[in-house]
């Protein structure tokens, strides 16, 4: 089994703020850091640090050499990365004193995938393999359909949410949504109702619903389960959801590690929020297995 991630590759410009800048306001920041990121890159690193065999596919911008190096250092295979001289993807992130974030995204070369490139990459994968997607790249619908034709199982993190309703979500095996995304897809507001509605609409899809500090839920053919969030002091929540996604898939696809997928993902994301940055905050599997609530 191999995991292919058609995923975004960004440089994250992170600004520490006492409070978020409001419309019409100019405010000096308390500090600035530059990190490797993008939901795709973060999730590839999370899966690799969790022990899954991961191949990342995407297009690097002119300044993207450090992104390739970061993936390689984490154990991600990078033979399906292509280089472009066009501007790459980047984000401008505000992080307030509570560790909450506000993110402005410029897609850059993440929106430059071509059908020929997608087909060439998918030709190296087949039945028994998994493709992971997020919504920070173009051609998501095309990749879903072509991957399904080749017998790959599809995992999809429906973030950012724009255009998601038009995708062939019935092809997705594992759908990751937060409360806002799940509510928009289902027309419901309560977590249990969101899960019921999405399972009724997509009966072949397992739905993973993240609830922030309230925990997470997972619904599939065997019913539903809930895992409360771990109580930790958050420093930066930027990479928490990506860490959760990568470790949940490790729980599903990897060897038994003694923790169910929801608990494994919850512990990993709890560790991630205690550290600054996105990709740099992702823990390795031994650390997650040794973690206890808040410790």
Annotate each predicted stretch with a short phrase.
Residues 1-9, 69-83, 93-226:
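Ribokinase/PfkB-type carbohydrate-kinase core domain
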Residues 1-23:
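Positively charged, low-complexity intrinsically disordered leader regions
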Residues 2-3, 23-90, 291-294:
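Substrate-binding N-lobe of the ribokinase-like
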Residues 21-31, 224-233:
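Glycine/charged-rich beta-loop-alpha catalytic/anionic-binding loops adjacent to active sites
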Residues 43, 142-145, 268:
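Aromatic/hydrophobic pocket-lining residues that form π-stacking "cages" and hydrophobic walls in ligand
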Residues 47, 178, 241:
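Short, conserved phosphate/pyrophosphate- and ester-handling motifs at nucleotide-, phospho-/glycolipid
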Residues 48, 148, 253:
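Gly/Ala-rich phosphate-binding loop of Rossmann-like dinucleotide-binding domains
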Residues 163, 192-295:
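Conserved phosphate-binding/catalytic region of the ribokinase-like
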């Amino acid at each position: 089994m191999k995991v292919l991630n058609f995923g975004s590759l960004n440089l994250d410009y992170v600004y520490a703020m006492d409070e978020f800048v409001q419309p019409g306001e100019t405010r000096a920041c308390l500090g600035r850091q530059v990190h490797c990121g993008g939901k795709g890159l973060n999730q590839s690193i999370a899966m690799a640090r969790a022990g899954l065999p991961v191949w990342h596919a995407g297009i690097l911008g002119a300044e993207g050499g450090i992104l390739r190096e970061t993936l390689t250092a984490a154990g991600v295979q990078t033979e399906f990365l292509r280089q472009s001289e066009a501007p790459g993807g980047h984000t401008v992130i505000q992080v307030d004193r509570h560790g909450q974030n506000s993110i402005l995204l410029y897609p850059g070369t993440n929106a430059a995938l071509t059908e020929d490139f997608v087909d060439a990459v998918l030709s190296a994968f087949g039945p028994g393999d998994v493709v992971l997607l997020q919504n920070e790249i173009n051609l998501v619908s095309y990749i879903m359909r072509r991957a399904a034709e080749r017998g790959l199982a599809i995992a999809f993190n429906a973030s950012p949410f724009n255009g998601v309703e038009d995708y062939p979500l019935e092809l997705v095996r594992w759908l990751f949504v937060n409360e806002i995304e799940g509510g928009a897809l289902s027309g419901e507001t309560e977590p249990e109702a969101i899960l019921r509605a999405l399972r009724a609409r997509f009966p072949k899809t397992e739905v993973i619903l993240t609830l922030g500090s309230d925990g997470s839920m997972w619904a599939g053919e065997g019913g539903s389960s809930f895992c409360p969030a771990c109580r930790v002091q958050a420093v930066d929540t930027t990479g928490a959801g990506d860490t959760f996604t990568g470790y949940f898939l490790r729980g599903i696809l990897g060897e038994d590690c003694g923790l169910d997928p929801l608990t494994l993902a919850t512990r990993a994301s709890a560790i991630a929020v205690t550290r600054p940055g996105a990709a740099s905050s992702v823990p390795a599997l031994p650390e997650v297995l040794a973690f206890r609530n808040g410790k």
